[in-house]
Design a protein with these regions (language model features):
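Acidic/His-enriched low-complexity segments
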Residues: 1-231
C-alpha cells in the first residue's frame, strides 16, 4: 500500500471515528537506525462492526492488539494497519520499530560534525506523524497526547507539554513523562531530544526555553530571543 491518504479516505474516516487519546512511548536508546514506538489509542466508532485503518510507516510492528485481541501479521502492510469489526469504544495498542530520518520527515536524526553530538527532532507536517507512532494521521481527528520518552542520560527531552516526571537514571538512560495535552492534530505534536544547550526564561508565569546545539551556543543572543518571544 502506498504511503498516501486520499481526500475521500480522510473524509470517510472523519465521519466514522472520534479519537479520544493517545499514549505514546518512545525509546530513543535502541541504536542509530531505529527506535521503539508504543502507541495506545482510545477511539470511538459511529458504526460498530465497520472497518477502517490506522497509519503507521515502519520497518516492523511486533505487536498489534485491538480490544484485547491480537491482529494477524498481514493486517500491517508497512504503511497502514487494517482494523476490522470495530466496536463502539475501542482500544488499540501497537508496538513498532520505527526508522530515523535523515531528510526531515518523521523523527530526524542529526550528528553534529563538530563534536559528534546526536540530536533528534520531529518534523510531522503535514503527513509524517505516523512515521513516529501509529495514528489516524489527519488534522481533523484531534485527540489528547501523552508522551513518555526514554533517552540517554544527560540529554534534554522536549515535547508539547512541560515534563512532570523525570525519572532517575537507569543504566545509561533516563525516562521523561509529559502529561496529557489539550486536543490537537497529529502533525502539531513534537518531540526533540539530545544534549541541547538550554537558555531558560519566563513571561507571565509561562516558562520559555531556547534550545540549540552545544557547538552553536546562543547565550550571547538569548536576551534578544527571549524578549522577542515574550512579544
Amino acid at each position: 500500500m502506498t504511503n498516501n491518504l486520499t481526500r475521500d479516505e480522510a473524509h470517510e474516516r472523519a465521519g466514522l471515528l472520534e479519537v479520544v487519546s493517545y499514549q505514546v512511548e518512545l525509546d530513543l536508546t535502541a541504536g542509530e537506525e531505529t527506535f521503539t514506538s508504543v502507541s495506545t489509542v482510545i477511539f470511538r466508532c459511529a458504526r460498530p462492526g465497520a472497518a477502517s485503518f490506522i497509519d503507521l510507516t515502519a520497518p516492523a510492528a511486533s505487536e498489534i492488539i485491538l480490544n484485547g485481541g491480537p491482529l494477524a501479521a498481514d493486517a500491517f502492510d508497512g504503511n497502514r494497519i487494517a482494523l476490522a469489526q470495530l466496536a463502539a469504544e475501542n482500544e488499540l495498542r501497537v508496538v513498532a520499530r520505527c526508522a530515523y530520518s535523515r531528510s526531515g520527515e518523521g523523527m530526524h536524526r542529526f550528528t553534529d560534525p563538530a563534536d559528534g553530538g546526536v540530536y533528534l527532532y520531529t518534523d510531522l507536517e503535514t503527513f509524517d506523524a505516523h512515521r513516529v507512532y501509529a495514528c489516524f494521521d489527519q488534522p481533523d481527528l484531534k485527540a489528547s497526547f501523552e508522551f513518555t520518552v526514554t533517552a540517554p542520560d544527560g540529554w534534554q527531552v522536549i515535547s508539547n507539554m512541560a515534563p512532570d516526571v523525570t525519572g532517575a537514571p537507569a543504566g545509561n538512560a533516563r525516562r521523561w513523562h509529559f502529561p496529557p495535552s489539550p486536543q490537537m492534530s497529529t502533525y502539531i505534536t513534537a518531540v526533540a531530544a539530545g544534549p541541547y544547550h538550554v537558555v531558560r526564561s519566563e513571561h507571565d508565569g509561562i516558562p520559555l526555553g531556547i534550545y540549540c546545539r552545544v557547538t552553536s551556543k546562543i547565550s550571547s543572543g538569548s536576551r534578544y530571543w527571549a524578549s522577542e518571544t515574550r512579544q
